Amino acid sequence: MKNAIILHGMPSKEGYYEPNRECPSNEHWLPWLQHQLIIKDILAQTPEMPRPYDPDYQEWLNVFNQFTINEDTILIGHSCGGGFLVRWLSENTIKVGKVILVAPWIDTDKILKSDFFNFKIDNNMSDKAESIVIFGSNNDDQEIKDSIDKLRNEIKNVKYKEFNFGHFVYSDMKTKEFPELLQEAIS
């Protein structure tokens, strides 16, 4: 059975503890995409990663490893979640289905004090996936553009699609629907 794992990004600590804000796994387009995949008989999960405002790779890995991951798995990561997937793919030999990195962030400016992004990118990670597609935006922050440039330059056979959706969050997109991402996931 096909399945999908959709990983959220890294909110600020203040935003994370804001009582009226949704959990990161329920923000933006993530719940909409999860539902659309489920009604297409793809078991989709949007796990809530621990302390997303101060991500620890081992803690995230412990949650991620609870899921079945194989050639029928679609992996989708937004921002820091995309960066997590790049590291996971770089450090593992498991073959997966599609990988879609939405505004992936790999901390090229070394903002994080943790070792979350302390890894070497596997230039051949595309060999471990049916395909790897990066969704970027021409009006995202420069640090995201820098991350995307680095990934496009280092990963062989990566595809790129450009949009005008900012950081692919609700405040930039003005919608919780993301049909372009759904189409890429199921095509």
Feature map (PLM): residue ranges:
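Active-site nucleophile loop of the alpha/beta-hydrolase fold
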Residues: 9-10, 48-52, 99-109, 137
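Catalytic histidine-centered segment of alpha/beta-hydrolase-like enzymes
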Residues: 55, 165-178
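Short, surface-exposed "cap/lid" segments of acyl-processing enzymes
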Residues: 1-40, 44
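Short beta-strand/loop motif that positions the catalytic acidic residue
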Residues: 128-129, 133-136
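Gly/Ala-rich beta-loop-alpha elbow adjacent to hydrolase catalytic centers
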Residues: 76-86
